[in-house]
Regions:
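Structural signature of alpha-solenoid helical repeat junctions
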Residues: 35, 57-60, 80, 100, ...
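Amphipathic alpha-helical segments of tetratricopeptide repeats
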Residues: 66-70, 107-117, 151-162
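Helix-turn-helix repeat elements of alpha-solenoid scaffolds
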Residues: 18, 55-67, 98-107
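Flexible helix-coil transition and linker loops at the boundaries of alpha-helical arrays
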Residues: 27-31, 71-76, 113-122
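"A position-specific structural signal for the A-helix of alpha-solenoid helical repeats
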Residues: 42, 87, 125, 132, ...
Length: 178
């Protein structure tokens, strides 16, 4: 197996002759990508909410969050990609990993801003993006930056029409360590 990895990494032709077996992933239609994105997103939430994750579950949570976002890239809007990046940032924040949490929270905001410009965003996307940045900064120990993003998220709550949506983000904001 190591020989195969070396051969492939050197750019040599694959020793697998069947193109179906040799392909990394089969072609999926948009519906399949969307279904996988949603299912993986929901699976990640079960692991985020689990108090006593094993090392294997932590790995699953990280990989599934990235995979969900990957599939949104094939079948979603900028808003979907922003939500995927938000979830990845949340995963890393839960794990106390500030650098990737910051990276993905910033990517979330960029996608959400693009989605707003394209008319694709829901009224809660901006507040959620700001919440993700506030959480990432809190994990990094940057209290002033976290407070700045938290204030922006709080201001953005006023744009959310559905009280249930607003309450979810208010709860997320309240749970951010100070």
């Amino acid at each position: 197996m190591l020989h195969v990895l070396r051969q492939l990494s050197a750019g040599e032709e694959s020793i697998v002759s069947d193109p179906q077996v040799a392909s990394i992933t089969p072609e999926l239609d948009q519906a399949a990508h969307r279904r996988l994105a949603v299912e993986l997103f929901n699976f990640v939430w079960t692991l985020i909410e689990k108090a006593d994750r094993t090392a294997a579950e932590i790995d699953q949570m990280i990989h599934a969050a990235h995979a969900s976002c990957h599939h949104w890239g094939h079948a979603g809007t900028n808003a979907n990609l922003g939500r995927g990046e938000w979830q990845i940032a949340r995963v890393y924040a839960v794990l106390g990993r500030a650098e990737p949490a910051r990276w993905h929270a910033a990517r979330c905001l960029a996608y959400v801003e693009t989605a707003i410009g394209a008319g694709e965003a829901d009224d809660w996307d901006l507040a959620a993006a700001y919440e993700g940045l506030a959480r990432a900064e809190a994990v990094a120990g940057a209290a002033a930056e976290s407070a700045r993003w938290r204030a922006m998220a709080t201001d953005a709550l006023g744009a959310i029409a559905d009280p249930a949506d607003r309450e979810i983000i208010e709860g997320d904001l309240a749970a951010i360590p100070r």
